[in-house]
């Protein structure tokens, strides 16, 4: 602790531990859900937080809150980040530290840029400054972040593949970047996606909250043309006027699909071939998401509900499921009063009243209320029929079409059920007839 005495004999004290204690207390309140006035939903996972902390750490949230003027019960859903990435970003806001896997370092920095987090944005800029075109073509080694820990700080990292990044007074000397970027593959420029991101981020820096559509012809042609050299182009040379539109003012109060829909994945994850799940035909932009999804088809469900024995792959999904047993439905429709357990379910329902169709097909003019309907529609454009009947090998583009086909054409159970119902009805009629006959006989005996 330091203190100063001025000429007027006024004593001033500086509490060096205040910042640490302040952050620790705020983080404890967040983890306990105390005084949280905002909930962020990412991939159906809800994160409670304090609005003032989000606005102080992120220029994106600051502009978003000013535009929406949300109240204390607001829930905001963002669909351009992975839930695990946002969880680490949120932990950084409250602890000034980030733990990130090496393969997710680039994604973490891109997410930090979009959210307007100064520390992650600076890391991304330092990483770009260190890399050079000569290194891109001569070296095959990967980027490596070397973080200098403060003396005496324990190492809680259990996985050697996790890098812990700390914001220590924003000192550039604490963070160094070693290694060289990966070599170019198939003639593609490794900076192409980054330049596209920079151009989009420049648009996101405006005062209005914007919605990004990255499936424009200019972007797609640049990413898919292997022989075209974009090294000499600058971010300012890329235009996205046709693909960027402002969020409509008549959007439902208290709700927002922040900064774009599923098309924003084109920017955030880069242009990649879609990976298809062999079990259900659902497509994914990277293998990590596919592996996470494949757990749904396996028996590995360690989180079991004690009330109905239903299993789940994550603890967050189990918590959402438990709301069904309690009957607690905190999300109510302002139009008809219908209540829902989850925020995404309410959002889907509200589109019934507003007729909002935010999911537009980039191949035609059709738009849809739900993302799943858009995916089914896009499969028809591509001619994909991933859902195959196990009895006759007939293929379908939608899972519902396959189920309908199996019920109509191969449902032996349905035929047995129908036969049983007919037999049961016949037995009931026979029993009723026998009862009437017995009553008539009793009446005859009584009269005689």
UniProtKB/Swiss-Prot annotation:
Residues 156-167 have a biased composition (Acidic residues). Residues 36-102 form the BTB domain. Residues 404-415 have a biased composition (Basic and acidic residues). PROSITE patterns: BTB (PS50097), ZINC_FINGER_C2H2_1 (PS00028), ZINC_FINGER_C2H2_2 (PS50157). GO terms for cellular component: nucleoplasm; nucleus. Residues 130-193, 404-425 are annotated as: Disordered. A motif (Nuclear localization signal) lies at residues 50-66. One of its GO terms (biological process) is regulation of cytokine production. GO terms for molecular function: DNA-binding transcription factor activity; DNA-binding transcription repressor activity, RNA polymerase II-specific; RNA polymerase II cis-regulatory region sequence-specific DNA binding; sequence-specific DNA binding; transcription cis-regulatory region binding; zinc ion binding. It comes from the Eukaryota. It is found in: Nucleus. Coiled coil: none annotated. A zinc finger (C2H2-type) spans 275-302, 303-330, 331-358, 359-386, 387-415. Interacts with ZBTB21. Belongs to the krueppel C2H2-type zinc-finger protein family. This is Zinc finger and BTB domain-containing protein 14. It comes from Gallus gallus. The lineage of its organism: Eukaryota, Metazoa, Chordata, Craniata, Vertebrata.
